[in-house]
Amino acid sequence: MPRTSGGHLGPDPGGLLSAPCGTVAGMSKAEGTFDIDRFDTQDPHDDRDGVKLARAHITKTFHGDLAGTSETDIITVHTENPAAYVGIERFDGTLRGRKGGFVLQHEAGGTDGVPWMTWKIVETSGTGDLAGIRGEGQIIIGADGGHSYTLDYEL
């Protein structure tokens, strides 16, 4: 994935801008933004035949319905285009005033030239007031490089 000078994913990280996601019936919707505080990449650990596999560690600060911090570990695959990644993120903070945490499973890539970035709450990973949380959503990277999120969830 391309990196900007700040070390984070740019406005179009290898063609990974996400597609719109609607609210799932019976679920609440959380929305907001997040800042990437650190984006530490490692050199590719597998680089052959035009395909590179690499790892990165990311720390974030969330604003909006989710307020708190997270740590994420991802494995990326770099090809001509689109790039892709999978990852695990642990969030700690509040969701609309409820204190706790949960783990998100990330997946991103492209299908027929249409990029997407999704995340899903790992079942039974909720803690504190967020125990029992379930849901899924998406990450959106704006044209200005800003990051926002949506999360359809139920408690």
Task: List each model region and its residues.
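Beta-strand-enriched cores of mature, soluble protein domains
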Residues: 20-155
